[in-house]
Amino acid sequence: MNLWEPILAMIMALTSFTIKPNPKAPTADAALVYAVDDADVVVHVDLQPTLIDNYPTWQKLADDPLIKQNAELAAGLRTVQTQVEGGRAMVKNLIGIDLTADLTSLTGFARMRGAGVPDFVVVVRGKFAADLPQRLVQPMGGKPETIDGRVAGATPDGMLIGLTKDGTLLAGQRDLVAPRLADAWKPAPRAKGSAWAQIATVLDQRPFFVLASKPSAAAATALAAQVNASFGRDLIAQHQLAIVSASATGVGWVYQAKDAAFAARIKLASEGWIELMRAAHIAPRGLVELAVAALPSYAGTSPELDDAIKHKDKILAAVDELTGDGKFTATVTQKGNLVTVITKGRRLSDVLPVGVVGLGVASAVLLGAKPKAATVSPRPPMMQPPARPSTPKPTPRPAPRPAPTPAPTR
């Protein structure tokens, strides 16, 4: 297989995947209606712009003209696609859910409890059959039970799975899930300026990914104890709230420190991180443009470089598609002990260089490929089989002497 072809094909394949704004993404009220008030961690993923919208592109990836040029790569990709489709079909046959069409978003809430598995509630939005909870718990030896006329499924280990009156699927510890399945459930109001209010502000911007940490004092201490003395340990121990989010046009983060002095350090670190993000766009562009400019000088020296020369326009196009010019907008503000960072471009790849890894590999191939003369290793000396012992032939007996001729008689 030509080394350059699969690398170029996969880099170009990345340009086929996109993340677009989802105007129908859950609002903060919808995402947090079943929130666990004392949760230490919150995770939210909008599956529509990430998985559902891009799955058809994944299905057609092996038919991409550039990938089809490499039979081995295309065959390997089709094998993976077949396995993925097999898993998708198996899940659909077992529980009646198409993982790439029926799920729209999910939100998870976790509450730490020492070194054990945290208590949690997972909230899944989508299209679900009324008997889904029962079908999910049956293989685990679970039993059905009814909550406000809807069938839920209880597992032997204390988990409960059920559908709410609005059709949302909940799963988690029984004491957390059962009250949320009831028709009478109402979320607690969010106090102005609280951690939940900050999380809601981020969710109302309709990001496709959110990770928030609002640890209790005990959870923060336990987590910090697992990290050696370092800036990372201080980040854990000093935060009251941390939120990271990603949208179709950029990324952002919020950090609420225990005091303004540490918040000032976070502000400085955030400004430095943004400079690195800008450099992550410019450096790969510079490396690839330099390499492409130099390529013609090495024509005919290796098949890899010749193939790169053939596709140099596509290489530059991939650079433009997967990186930006580093000129995205960014604001870093500090108000007391709260630091807020917002970045924005025309698209996510203008801010977050999603192709930097692939382009880095490509640059390494372009700059590091050298013609190698074919070498033939000398054949190892052949082992001579030992000579078979030979039996000496007997020495022939000498022929008898002829009898003397008698003298003549006189």
Language-model segments: which ranges?
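Short, surface-exposed beta-strand/loop micro-motifs that present aromatic residues
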Residues: 31, 106-111, 157-164, 240-244
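One face of beta-strands
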Residues: 39-45, 120-124, 239-242, 249-255, ...
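Extended amphipathic alpha-helical interaction segments
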Residues: 187-248, 255-258
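Sec-dependent signal peptide recognition
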Residues: 2-10
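A short, solvent-exposed beta-edge/loop patch
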Residues: 155-187, 247-249, 331-350
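Contiguous hydrophobic, core-forming segments of folded domains
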Residues: 25-28, 37-39, 163-205, 252
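Solvent-exposed coil/turn segments that connect beta secondary-structure elements
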Residues: 46-48, 125-129, 166-167, 174-176, ...
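Structural boundary/hinge residues at secondary-structure and domain interfaces
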Residues: 14-154, 197-227, 274-329, 351-410
